UniProtKB/Swiss-Prot annotation:
The gene is grpE1. Keywords: Chaperone, Cytoplasm, Stress response. This is Protein GrpE 1. InterPro entries: GrpE, GrpE_coiled_coil, GrpE_head. Residues 1-44, 192-221 are annotated as: Disordered. Participates actively in the response to hyperosmotic and heat shock by preventing the aggregation of stress-denatured proteins, in association with DnaK and GrpE. It is the nucleotide exchange factor for DnaK and may function as a thermosensor. Unfolded proteins bind initially to DnaJ; upon interaction with the DnaJ-bound protein, DnaK hydrolyzes its bound ATP, resulting in the formation of a stable complex. GrpE releases ADP from DnaK; ATP binding to DnaK triggers the release of the substrate protein, thus completing the reaction cycle. It holds the Pfam family GrpE. Residues 203-221 have a biased composition (Basic and acidic residues). Belongs to the GrpE family. The lineage of its organism: Bacteria, Bacillati, Actinomycetota, Actinomycetes, Kitasatosporales. GO terms for molecular function: adenyl-nucleotide exchange factor activity; protein homodimerization activity; protein-folding chaperone binding; unfolded protein binding. It comes from the Bacteria.
Amino acid sequence: MTEETPGFDEKPDVPSGATPEDAEPKAAPSEGAAPAGDAAAAAQTAAQTAGLTAQLDQVRTALGERTADLQRLQAEYQNYRRRVERDRIAVKEIAIANLLTELLPTLDDIGRAREHGELVGGFKSVAESLETVAAKMGLQQFGKEGEPFDPTIHEALMHSYAPDVTETTCVAILQPGYRIGERTIRPARVAVAEPQPGAQTVKADEAEAADDKESGGPEEG
């Protein structure tokens, strides 16, 4: 009996349940798979970076808005403080002005008594003390004879003409004026004199004649 030699046409032993495809060697992974994974990771990182950048921009915007709000509140507070201080000073000045206004008749009496030589003894000391206190509170007296009339600080009670004045002039102080700082609490009550009508023309003619007399005349030979 002749022994049979296995030929090439015989199929190798294949485990049961396996297919011919399983018997074939598997192909190695392609080289493009790794770059694809790196690209996905890079894209994810870029997305995260973009998200963080957007959040940072939002935080910066919110910080800028809060900073602007704080600066605005600080400016409003400073304006409020200045306004309160200004109002406080104004109220104080009004209160002082009202008090000193009530004292003006007494100061007028003191002035008249001084003019008539009646400011003597204890009354003189009291009067001078009152005037000193009023001056410390900012009261200033104004109004002098011979100064030009100013309707903003003078009140003309008497009016006349005078040949020796060149403009409306205070010729008598009937009642002195008083002010506190730049605020006038009572104008000076005065008598005023205006230039005599025609007086300036006469004076000009006289001056011209005097000049002619000094410069003219026949020359001596």
